[in-house]
Design a protein with these regions (language model features):
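C-terminal helical subdomain
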Residues: 201, 209, 217-257
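N-terminal Rossmann NAD(P)H-binding glycine-rich loop of SDR-like oxidoreductase domains
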Residues: 28-44
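Rossmann-fold cofactor-recognition segment
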Residues: 58-80
Length: 257
């Protein structure tokens, strides 16, 4: 990933070595701050044609809509994506899952094990791990069996067990650790199916979105969603099959699981 480390954070371009085959890109979680920025960046690449001439977006408010609590909605959405690709005579070459949950009416991240709550844990795992697992079930089969393709799941550095020195945020940390394991396991199966496939978990940094807003008020440094999206797409462009199954940050550096 040295190339990604040296690449300008705002320079998402078609790979010079033809690393991407033209095809469709799909962003799931497109209504969120980061997801919307990813769609916008993919849809308007400065300086040249996009390697993804068709950009599809799905969210809870899209048509069709997806609901991680309703697996039938995921199957219906996958069928829609397959039909969209077929009508354009394109293959799905890029899948990005940018959905995530940290806080809301269901609860807040825990500071202590005395604050652990079953309802919050169930919801954070539903959105951050179970939902993406069902995305794998219904959308990974749409990726081609030949040629480069990428499945990227937005994770978080706090999901790293080896990097956990602060504690707290039990549910969020554990759900992202579960996502990382799901990504690793799926990467093994995808490689058997297509040796040029790449399946990774990506840490975007702390992005200025609704997810981070309550914590930005405490002085936590946040990054604009547009910049975070450009950084992630620059990393994606430099990925090789040797990176599959890894957790990487927005600079392309590998993080411990």
């Amino acid at each position: 990933m040295n190339a990604a480390e040296n690449q300008d954070a705002r320079s998402f371009q078609p790979a010079a070595n033809g690393g991407s085959l033209a095809g469709a890109a799909l962003v799931i979680g497109a209504a969120g701050g980061l997801g919307a920025a990813l769609v916008a960046n993919l849809s308007s690449v400065a300086g040249g044609p996009s390697p993804y001439p068709a950009v599809l977006a799905l969210s809870r408010s899209s048509l069709p809509a997806i609901d991680y609590g309703d697996e039938a909605s995921l199957k219906a959405a996958a069928d829609w994506v397959a039909a969209q690709c077929a009508s354009r005579q394109m293959e799905l070459r890029l899948l990005i899952v940018a959905s995530g949950f940290l806080h809301g009416p269901q609860g807040q991240p825990e500071r202590s094990f005395t604050q652990l709550d079953a309802g919050y844990l169930q919801h954070v795992f539903q959105v951050n791990a179970i939902g993406p697992a069902l995305v794998m079930k219904h959308f990974l089969p749409l990726l081609p069996k030949q040629g480069r393709c990428v499945a990227a799941f937005v994770s978080a550095r706090v999901g790293s067990i080896g990097d956990n020195a602060l504690g707290g945020w039990y549910g969020y940390r554990a759900s992202k650790a579960a996502l990382n394991q799901l990504v690793k396991t799926a990467s093994v199966e995808l490689t058997r199916r297509n040796r040029q496939s790449v399946c990774v978990a990506l840490h975007p940094g702390t992005v200025d979105t609704a997810l981070s807003q309550p914590f930005a008020k405490t002085g936590l440094k946040v990054r604009p969603a547009e910049g975070a999206a450009s950084d992630l797409l620059a990393v994606i462009q430099c990925l090789t099959p040797g990176d599959t199954g890894c957790l990487l940050d927005y600079k392309g550096l590998k993080l411990p699981f």
